[in-house]
Swiss-Prot record:
Phylogenetic classification of the source organism: Bacteria, Pseudomonadati, Pseudomonadota, Gammaproteobacteria, Enterobacterales
Organism of origin: Cronobacter sakazakii (strain ATCC BAA-894)
Residues annotated as transmembrane: 9-29
Family: Belongs to the CcmE/CycJ family.
Function noted in UniProt: Heme chaperone required for the biogenesis of c-type cytochromes. Transiently binds heme delivered by CcmC and transfers the heme to apo-cytochromes in a process facilitated by CcmF and CcmH.
UniProt signal peptide: none
Keyword list, A-Z: Cell inner membrane, Cell membrane, Cytochrome c-type biogenesis, Heme, Iron, Membrane, Metal-binding, Signal-anchor, Transmembrane, Transmembrane helix
The name this protein goes by in its record: Cytochrome c-type biogenesis protein CcmE
Gene, per the UniProt record: ccmE
Subcellular location: Cell inner membrane
Gene Ontology BP terms: cytochrome complex assembly
Length: 159
């Protein structure tokens, strides 16, 4: 192999290795920033055919209805705890911050945060349903499939 071809080969291999490393780092960074959507029942019993449950410490978004009578506010701080339910389960959510104006019992909300060891969601952000005309497709599908009875019909069925 002549020196010119050898140099081209090394340059090509170096460029390919650099691109591979760049892609690996980008994919790793994106993986760390993904928040998967779950319903309360999927958190408790698993999601999909494989019944995959989220791991404690995993970042996630959970969508459901705020259970009537479950909102507890701390009088000395902005801490709030409430329960989200769907047809398959109930999960507790803790939040420290100002709730949206449209947050109320019986309304649909999405809480974004981290799943704790105690199966509680420690939310960083709470989003309240703001418009009846638009709901993200995955939230609408989950709500239609899981909310067929009145709130009083759901029990605390945590494992």
């Amino acid at each position: 192999m002549n020196p010119r071809r050898k140099t081209r080969l090394w340059v090509a291999l170096t460029v390919l290795a650099g691109l591979g490393l760049t892609m690996a780092l980008v994919l790793y960074a994106l993986r760390a920033n993904i928040d998967l959507f779950y319903t309360p029942g999927e958190i408790l019993y698993g999601k999909g055919a494989a019944q995959e449950k989220p791991e404690p410490g995993q970042r996630l978004r959970v969508g459901g209805m705020v259970m009537p009578g479950s909102v507890k506010r701390d009088s000395r701080s902005l801490k709030v705890s409430f329960r989200l339910y769907d047809a398959r389960g109930v999960v507790d959510v803790d939040y420290d911050g100002i709730l949206p104006d449209l947050f109320r019992e019986g309304q649909g909300v999405v809480a974004q945060g981290v799943l704790g060891d105690d199966q509680r969601i420690h939310a960083r952000e709470v989003l309240a349903k703001h418009d009846e005309n638009y709901t993200p497709p995955e939230v609408k599908a989950a709500m239609d499939a899981n909310h067929t009875r009145p709130p009083q019909a759901y029990k605390d069925n945590r494992p």
